[in-house]
Amino acid sequence: MKMRSKYAIILFFVVALVIIEKERNIISRVSDKFTLKFPHAESVAPNNTISARSLTKNNSLLANSVAAVWKLLKARRSYSSLQSAASSDVRKVLKGRKHLLLMATTRTGSSFVGEFFNQNNDIFYLFEPLWHVEKTVTFEPGGMNAVASSIIYRDVVQQLMLCDLYTLENFLFPMADRHLTGILFRRGSSKSLCEGEVCTPPKKGGTEKFPCRLRDCGLLNLTLATQACLQKQHVAIKTVPLRQLEFLRPLVEDFRINLKIIQLVRDPRAVLASRMVAFPSKYNAWKKWANEGRVPDDDEVGKIRGNCENLRATAQLGISQPPWLKDRFLLMRYEDIALEPVKRAQEMYRFSGIPMTPEVKKWIYENTQVSKASNNIYSTHKISSEQFEKWRLGLPFKIARVVQQVCEPAMKLFGYKLVKDAATLANRSASLLENRNFWIT
């Protein structure tokens, strides 16, 4: 219980740091909805949570608060010392550095597109670092949920763009020991975390939950990872939970960060079809409708509508190019990338201001022209021009029609054609794409 309280205090002060910023009034209105989640332990009941309000009232936790704050300040001090000790060569790199944020939702091809930047040796690429934040910090349902969570996600991304990987320690459970961790989500999907000095020799007793793919590395040393980030010319982050563009304005206006944002979208009918396969239990209501005729309840349909509306609102804001976003936002359709991967990769690189390397082109060719596509739903090896519309043969028209009804505004903005019958849906010779040029000069 003592350790649990320590974890709670640490996260509470992370949120306290956010409250100090511009959004102080917003966060204060939702503090009663804030929930902290902790990993299961023998002495902790599953699904147990502690609210931020109860933490402030629990005087027994005050004794731990000083130690918790000191831990956070110590991490910041460690990062600051690394920056101060950076060589003149590293400082030159930082001066011309570009920062890229790839925003997407699940099953939109973001892992595949993210590899376009992961394969560039000049880029420090992080694969979904907010996964740990999302699993640790949640909010009770309510109108302010998206606001509060977006602010926390944004602030973590801001620190990561500045190569402050110690920030992640506040959301890792079990906690990192001397900046060593074996549980960073999908570490193997970030080349920068599995190469050079970051790939330390494995030691006995050190187990990686998400090991590197091609090399046998020891536990991830966040100090070495931070140093590697500072030495790379550019930083790119692929993230899923951060979806509301308007909350990124402080990040865009941060003079230390030269940020470009790419929003990746996909036909919502295809997204639902893919999620039904990848997450069968979560989308069981839709599968039952497809197989047994049981109509999903309004809540399930409402989730689809809400997702589409969030995507539309973000894209509309980005395309409108307000002064703070001028030349900093690009909307890309997954389907366009699947059809012309090299061309679209070149567009994204040109937009980001980062040179595209031969290694990236080689990877794209080898992973989009493979002789046989992988059956692994998480694979990035695809015959992309053949795979992107495969969903049309498996999704029942009655489900596609519901998605069209609730997502029509977003589909029209993104240029996805509606279908009127099952025959048209299954006819892959009839394109569902309208010509769109979202390139912003």
Swiss-Prot record:
Q: What is its EC number?
A: 2.8.2.17, 2.8.2.21
Q: Where are the transmembrane segments?
A: 5-21
Q: How does the protein associate with the membrane?
A: Single-pass type II membrane protein
- What pairs make up the disulfide bonds? none
Keyword Secreted present in the record's keywords: the answer is: no
Task: Give the InterPro entries listed for this entry.
Answer: Carbohydrate_sulfotransferase, Gal/GlcNAc/GalNAc_ST, P-loop_NTPase, Sulfotransferase_dom
Question: Residues on the Lumenal side?
Answer: 22-441
List cellular component terms (GO): Golgi membrane
- Describe how it is modified after translation: N-glycosylated.
Instruction: Quote the record's binding site residues for 3'-phosphoadenylyl sulfate.
Output: 106-112, 266-274
Q: Which GO terms describe its molecular function?
A: chondroitin 6-sulfotransferase activity; N-acetylglucosamine 6-O-sulfotransferase activity
According to its UniProt record, which reaction does this protein catalyse? chondroitin beta-D-glucuronate + n 3'-phosphoadenylyl sulfate = chondroitin 6'-sulfate + n adenosine 3',5'-bisphosphate + n H(+); 3'-phosphoadenylyl sulfate + keratan = adenosine 3',5'-bisphosphate + keratan 6'-sulfate
What is this protein's tissue specificity according to the annotation?
In electric organ, it is moderately expressed in spinal cord and electric lobe and undetectable in non-neural tissues. Expressed in a punctate distribution in the innervated portion of electrocytes. In the CNS, it is localized within the somas of motor neurons and neurons of the electromotor nucleus.
Ranges in the Cytoplasmic compartment?
A: 1-4
Q: Name one GO biological process term.
A: carbohydrate metabolic process
Q: Which UniProt keywords apply?
A: Carbohydrate metabolism, Glycoprotein, Golgi apparatus, Membrane, Signal-anchor, Transferase, Transmembrane, Transmembrane helix
Please provide an example of a Pfam family that matches this protein in its UniProt record: Sulfotransfer_1
* Glycan-bearing residues: N47, N58, N221, N427
Where the protein is mainly located, per its record?
Golgi
Location within or outside the cell: Golgi apparatus membrane
Q: What is the uppermost EC class here? A: transferase
Record's function text? Sulfotransferase that utilizes 3'-phospho-5'-adenylyl sulfate (PAPS) as sulfonate donor to catalyze the transfer of sulfate to position 6 of the N-acetylgalactosamine (GalNAc) residue of chondroitin. Chondroitin sulfate constitutes the predominant proteoglycan present in cartilage and is distributed on the surfaces of many cells and extracellular matrices. Catalyzes with a lower efficiency the sulfation of Gal residues of keratan sulfate, another glycosaminoglycan. Can also catalyze the sulfation of the Gal residues in sialyl N-acetyllactosamine (sialyl LacNAc) oligosaccharides.
Q: Which family does it belong to?
A: Belongs to the sulfotransferase 1 family. Gal/GlcNAc/GalNAc subfamily.
According to UniProt, the name of this protein is: Carbohydrate sulfotransferase 3
Q: Which organism is it from?
A: Tetronarce californica (Pacific electric ray)
Protein's gene: CHST3
